[in-house]
């Protein structure tokens, strides 16, 4: 089992924005959810503004909730339209991600990219179990194709380690992987979310570049956890927590898919 020796505890812009969107239930006060196309969106760019009964939705930072693409805007509108008597942020992972991106990523893209690089430096897929052999084989099955993709598509050659001992990655490999990071706040923010949810910047990058599906990515993330549950039985609390995180991961994957590689 792989245990990171580097603990990524940051107080960066993404974390600050996430704290501002902690779930609190509020009674639903609107009837209609609409999209106003061509209005000023994030950072003054044209986008698709979300409105409740004709009034623009504001983020916790008092910015306009506007998406850069029509499909993404429709997905956001669907979340708001699906709310019942109360507005439940837990059931709105895409809106929470959008708020985080708009409030926390736009003015801090270099810092967000640096956080992704930290994850890449001690990525999940670089650390393999010393035993048993069937677990090592399963890790290789899910993770080796990602390493091959990084080598062929990005020119990044990473080193593998066994157990819990940290393995320093070549600066050139990290530089080449980071050169594939997006430069707009929406995709960068979604990539950061996928990275922190999976513990793997490489899996997130592969998702961005269509080298892996969201379902396969999520399965790859849980190789070790699934193995343990097969050996010792399932943990209902852990599975419930995984379900919440999967919803958040799917929101990030949706942003990456709808906005494309650009």
Set out the residue ranges of the language-model regions.
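An N-terminal structural lobe/cap that precedes and organizes the functional/catalytic core
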Residues: 2-107
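Expand to "…catalyze enediolate/carbanion chemistry for C-C bond making/breaking, isomerization
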Residues: 3-4, 222-223, 229-262
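Generic secondary-structure signature for well-ordered alpha-helical cores
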Residues: 81-85, 151, 155, 207-212, ...
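Conserved active-site and cofactor/substrate-binding residues in soluble primary-metabolism enzymes
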Residues: 67-71, 75, 107, 141, ...
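An internal, amphipathic alpha-helical element
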Residues: 166-239
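Short cationic amphipathic helices and targeting signals
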Residues: 63-67, 125-127, 134, 203
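Internal, conserved structured core segments that host functional sites
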Residues: 110-176
């Amino acid at each position: 089992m792989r245990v990171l020796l580097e603990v990524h505890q940051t107080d960066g812009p993404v974390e600050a924005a996430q704290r501002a969107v902690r779930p609190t239930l509020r009674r639903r006060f609107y009837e209609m959810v609409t999209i106003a196309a061509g209005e000023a969106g994030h950072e003054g760019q044209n986008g698709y503004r979300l409105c409740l009964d004709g009034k623009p939705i504001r983020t916790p930072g008092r910015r306009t909730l506007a998406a850069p693409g029509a499909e993404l805007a429709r997905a956001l509108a669907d979340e708001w339209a699906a709310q019942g008597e109360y507005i439940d942020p837990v059931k709105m992972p895409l809106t929470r991600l959008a708020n985080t991106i708009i409030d926390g990523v736009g003015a801090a893209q270099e810092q967000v990219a640096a956080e992704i690089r930290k994850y890449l430096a001690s990525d999940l897929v670089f650390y393999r179990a010393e035993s048993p052999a069937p677990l090592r084989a399963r890790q290789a099955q899910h993770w080796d194709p990602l390493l091959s993709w990084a080598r062929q598509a990005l020119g990044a050659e990473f080193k593998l380690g066994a157990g819990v001992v940290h393995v320093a990655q070549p600066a050139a490999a990290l530089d080449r992987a980071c050169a594939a990071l997006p430069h707009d706040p929406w995709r960068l923010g979604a990539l950061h979310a996928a990275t922190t949810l999976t513990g793997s910047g490489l899996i997130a990058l592969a998702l961005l570049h269509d080298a892996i599906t969201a379902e396969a990515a999520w399965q790859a993330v849980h190789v070790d956890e699934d193995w343990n549950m097969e050996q010792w039985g399932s943990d209902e609390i852990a599975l419930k927590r995984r379900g919440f995180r999967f919803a958040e991961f799917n929101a990030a994957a949706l942003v990456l898919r709808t906005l494309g590689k650009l």
